[in-house]
């Protein structure tokens, strides 16, 4: 799927794969392999997107807990503009499934993190509800931001009242909690100002950004202005769990800007 950009890649490969995790036997096999690979790599801390399925996401947390790794794991929320097999009925159903998952997500080292996939697949009501849940329970948040130009254009249609992508999260309170935003490849200056003001942590994912032709994040500029930036492998758009490979790619692509 590396011949596709983000949105086409999601529809052609990622969403069909994620739909399979409704089957717990499949989820156990796939997540077992993932956790084993992670354990064998140089990674000891991970922040992970699950799928929309509460039971499968809890299973992933159980496997990570047993591995000895320290992690944050998110049950994904999506109630619009995604395949029917993954689309939750509405905001209320998505929030109820999240509460169900949180009730079972009680581990010493695998912690929950709220995970709206991205603005295009989440209604305003869902984003607002997740923001309220984050504030009420003191939970961190992770999502995607300004990864791809097509994605950014897609946000403008359902959110005409916002001047830039991150405002759609911020007006729902999702940047007010401890927050990780993946990618941030195409953040305009005013978006960078907001991320800095809210203390958002950027997960720079150079392997996946190269593989999906998303662009090269201006990480040196982000660091110079005091933004917090770390590295992410972003499986499976990134092809390895090994963060040493990610470090090498970050250096390599930074020379091309």
Residue map of PLM features:
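Alpha-helical scaffold segments that flank or form the walls of functional sites
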Residues: 2-69, 94-107
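Hydrophobic residues within beta-strands of alpha/beta enzymes
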Residues: 46-47, 141, 230
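Short, acidic/turn-prone active-site loops that include or flank metal/cofactor-
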Residues: 76-79, 147, 206-210, 235-237
């Amino acid at each position: 799927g590396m011949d596709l950009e983000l949105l086409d890649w999601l529809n052609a490969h990622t969403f069909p794969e994620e739909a399979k995790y409704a089957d717990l036997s499949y989820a156990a096999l796939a997540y077992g392999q993932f956790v084993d690979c992670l354990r064998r790599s140089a990674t000891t801390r991970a922040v992970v997107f699950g799928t929309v399925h509460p039971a499968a996401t809890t299973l992933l947390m159980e496997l990570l807990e047993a591995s000895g790794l320290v992690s944050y794991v998110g049950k994904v929320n999506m109630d619009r503009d995604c395949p029917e097999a993954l689309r939750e009925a509405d905001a209320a159903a998505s929030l109820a499934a999240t509460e169900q998952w949180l009730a079972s997500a009680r581990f010493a080292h695998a912690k929950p993190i709220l995970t709206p996939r991205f603005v295009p697949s989440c209604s305003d009501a869902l984003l607002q509800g997740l923001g309220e849940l984050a504030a009420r329970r003191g939970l961190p948040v992770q999502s995607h931001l300004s990864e791809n130009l097509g994605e950014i254009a897609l946000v403008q249609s359902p959110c005409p009242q916002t001047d830039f992508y991150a405002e759609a999260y911020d007006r729902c309170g999702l940047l007010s909690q401890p927050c990780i935003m993946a990618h941030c490849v195409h953040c305009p200056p005013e978006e960078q100002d907001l991320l800095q003001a809210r203390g958002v942590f950027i997960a720079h994912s150079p392997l996946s950004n190269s593989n999906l032709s998303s662009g090269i994040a201006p990480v040196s500029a982000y660091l110079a202005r005091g933004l917090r930036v770390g590295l992410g492998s972003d499986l499976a758009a990134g092809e390895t769990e090994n963060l040493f490979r990610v470090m090498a790619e970050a250096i390599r692509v930074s020379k091309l800007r």
